[in-house]
């Protein structure tokens, strides 16, 4: 059995945890909206056509904010197409995903659904094929009380009260050649700055997110962030990061080490923000919005076949990754990395919420179930609210195909207002259990410990509609007398220490 030690001190804080790091993402892509959250005629549909069974799973997940409506989709989207009488809305070709969009769900319907889900809306504006004036107009439509043409139009369309959307994305992945209206860093920085100014002049209470690089592998990564922020630093609040990982070569140990890369990515972008801050002699800190993150690779080949079989279809089953147990472990490790960077990462949205690379799956006309990755997301959101503490981990390390000195255990710790401390830990070792000694200096005495474990002997095990509980957390014995717990091989662990 491997040995590890975790040292915590209540005075060694990283930062208060912004609850928005447990956010998600709904894009008009595949079956995320249609036959995902929205399916009129389904036995579980409410009066507005939204599935109650899906809504209940979303509420259980504890998602505080949802990014909408894209994604690549937003760079060709006209928000006016999705307001007014539903039967009069146009169908449009979506060039981003080669499908047909019926516009049955728009800002009115989605805002009403988000309220039921106890979630805020994080709205993305189109800065690809549109510009600053259109971005200002949607803020006026959504957030202005009344008395102007656009706010009165919202009232006419059934929403007397403003939607009160507080967080806005200035486009999506504008460095990507796959993006409609992609731009150079300077071009985008100028447009983002003007859009942010006009949006904030309309509603001074909002915050905005500038597009960072689409990923750290982009040829302009780093240079893009610096150039963009040089143009818009004073008017933006966050810069976005997007990061996905996969295991196409079936190298689980290397796959589980991927968060070494994520941590470096986060720290690098934070440093670039600070470099621009220093250059401008600014007192303002721009923070990070990791508003797309997940495992994504299972469905890639099938998606290409589907495009050939059904060009320009509606609600096609695109990006429907079926997640296995090792994917859940990596999602847990990514959550740990986010918590350890809580001083800079203030927003994070797992992409996406339902069916499309998602923790929740549905069958049209049928059931809804939790994928393996649902569990670490739910537990982190439920127990990871409070102050992120600085963990000192002592454990063995190993090398993988692409990474060196990978700790066999990674962990984060959060203390809530009631003095409860929750540890999130992953044992990366695929074969050996790990005895973890927890050193709680300066904490005093805890009266009770609760240890939840997510483990399966088969790292490729999945949850399905027929077998939805193949991979599910279970409670284990926790004895505080020795301040020691056992982390099973290849496991996600939630250890709650109650005062």
What is the predicted function of each stretch?
Residues 1-224, 229-238, 262-263, 267-307, ...:
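Non-catalytic accessory regions flanking glycosidase/transglycosidase catalytic cores in CAZymes
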Residues 242-257:
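Active-site His/acidic residue clusters
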